[in-house]
Amino acid sequence: MATFRFVVADVFTDAREIPEERLQPLAREINFSETVYVYPAAGDGHALMRIFTPSGELPFAGHPILGTAVVLAGPLQLEEIRLETGRGIVPVRLEREGPRIVFGWMQQPVPVWEPFEPAEELCRLLGATPTDLPLELYRQGPGHVLVELGSPDEVAALSPDFGSLARFMDEGAACFAHDGDHWKLRVFVPAYGVPEDPATGSAAGPLALHLARHGRIGFGDEIEIRQGVEIGRPSTLHAVARSEEEIEVGGSAIVVARGEFRLP
């Protein structure tokens, strides 16, 4: 049973005094899917952020960007915050009810994509039987191979060989199926020290684009994505591909704790 039945990221709002060599060990010790270190802006953004998983740094990841936007923009009453990332400036548009932020939409970097050639081996390691939709690798910072299965029950039943999967590929495997009024998604990223990710914005945007490119939805159609159920951390994201060059992902976040972290 997860301690928190939601997706957790931690944000160091001023990381200037944390030595560079401590960033990765600290993220590994905290062991959340992502740890964010915030610095003064270097360019035209409001702040610069660096994102670490337990095993490495990412140039971009959706879930921690939304969380960081809520943490930083909340007290400032901003309607939009521009965050500098390894993939450039990411604008996050915020929706409020009174002083409280209830939702955020981020403009995502445009991914590049290509066919994933060792598809048969990946499906063997996942224990998955794909549909006829092509397996394609999308890179938006971290890469994800999108794998459609025939039903949400098949997605729920997946039990990958994580050790072999981590040795086989550096990217994540994003397995999905249509489930009534939404899409069910599970994302496995053992190479980054995250066997299963509870919420993956950097896969949600590419999923909307993938579905639109292959005619499963129309460009401009908003989809709801549910993820994290099997690991006790259910999440909901929304995504829309307005074109191949314009992708937005949205979700909600709240601050559940504040405090000081004292480094020895």
Region roles according to the model:
Residues 1-60, 66-264:
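Active-site proximal loop and beta-alpha junction motif in alpha/beta enzyme cores
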